[in-house]
Every structure is written in C-alpha cells, then in structure tokens.
C-alpha cells in the first residue's frame, strides 16, 4: 500500500496482522507524507518462502523496497513484530533512518533473557509457534478460532475489531502458506537473539 506525497514513512505491522492494520493511519498520514505500508515477509500478500524470517533478512527486504522506490531516508514505524524488523533495520542501516518509532515491543534479547514460567504462561503462543509443523496442522481450517483468541484476549477493547477487519485477517491466514509464514517469523527468534547480541 502506498499513498500520499512528501517525506517517506514506512509502516510495519505486527502479528497477527497485515498492512491492513494501518488502514486508519494511512489516510491521515498521507495528507503530509508519502506512506508505504508493506506486508512483512510471510504475511498478507507477500511470498511465503521456507526461510529468511530472521529480522536481519526482513530488514534487507525493507532496504530493497526502499531501493526499488528510490528512497534515501525514511521515518520507520513498527508495531509488535514490525517493531523488531524496524529496530534491526535501524541497527543495520542507521544512515537510512530519519526517525524510528517502535510500539508494543520488548527487545528480543530481553524476552530471551527474562523468559520464566510466569512469562511462558502469559506468552504461551511464542513457544507454541516455535514447534515445527504442529501449529500449522492444528490451525488449518480453524484460522478464525486461532485469530479470535488474539483479537479477543490480547486486545484492550475487542469491540474495536470490526467483523470486516476480523474477516480480512481470517482470509489472509487462509491463504496457502500464510500460517507457516507467521510461524517462521517466531521460529527465527533464536537467530534474532544471536544477531542482537553480536
């Protein structure tokens, strides 16, 4: 998605979203900025490759997008998983970042360092998503149940997620390889930690 003219702003969505998550911000921001809201690798309408979900590689995806669009420097805004990509991008390509905004995110290395039983219970899905092939098998055909959990239990005010928005995300995750793409994002966590600690 791309709208508007002016200084470029790239919006990176979180899990379990797609660029559709920015549908309310894009019209407002595009009054003054050139707004670009891609789907992250493995999410939404992107390809669903078998590998390359570490945040350094996903940051390279954003760098390539900038190259294709002829962008020299951007304001980079990331939410949740998108914040992890944005942070990695800012570390690897600081000369390309005018401003960085990260929302709803704890740094990868902190999550890994502070993981305990209490946090594991609260963030059970982080660990569930790491198991090879099982989440995909259990979620297939039940995407609406899986997504309902996140949009009900993990949302401050679940009534803000309209039926239209929910159905949009369900359709996105029913696409071939979509659940695997999201799981691969989480499965790259150990590699992300190693990159952050280097």
Q: Where are these predicted regions, by residue range?
A:
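A short loop-to-beta-strand scaffold at the N-terminal edge of the catalytic core in hydrolase folds
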Residues: 1-3
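Flexible "cap/lid" subdomain of the alpha/beta-hydrolase fold that forms the substrate-access gate
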Residues: 8, 22, 36, 43-77, ...
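Conserved residues at beta->alpha junctions
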Residues: 13-16, 173
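The serine-hydrolase catalytic nucleophile loop
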Residues: 15-26
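Alpha-helical and His/Cys-centered functional microenvironments
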Residues: 17, 29, 83
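Active-site machinery of serine-nucleophile hydrolases
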Residues: 29-39
């Amino acid at each position: 998605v791309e709208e508007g003219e002016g200084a470029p702003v790239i919006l990176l969505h979180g899990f379990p979203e797609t660029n559709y998550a920015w549908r309310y911000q894009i019209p407002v921001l595009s009054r003054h900025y050139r707004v670009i809201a891609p789907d992250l690798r493995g999410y939404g309408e992107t390809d669903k490759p078998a590998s390359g979900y570490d945040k350094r590689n996903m940051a390279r995806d954003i760098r390539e997008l900038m190259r294709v669009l002829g962008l020299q420097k951007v304001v980079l805004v990331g939410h949740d998983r998108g914040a992890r990509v944005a942070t990695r991008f800012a570390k690897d390509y600081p000369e390309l970042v005018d401003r960085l905004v990260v929302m709803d995110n704890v740094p990868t290395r902190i999550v890994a360092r502070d993981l305990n039983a209490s946090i594991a219970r609260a963030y059970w899905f982080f660990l569930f998503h790491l198991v090879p092939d099982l989440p995909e098998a259990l979620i297939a055909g039940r995407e609406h149940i899986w997504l309902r959990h996140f949009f009900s239990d993990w949302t401050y005010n679940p009534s803000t997620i309209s039926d239209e928005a929910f159905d949009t995300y369900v359709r996105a995750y029913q696409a071939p390889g979509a659940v695997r793409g999201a799981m691969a994002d989480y499965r790259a966590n150990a590699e992300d930690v190693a990159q952050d600690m280097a």
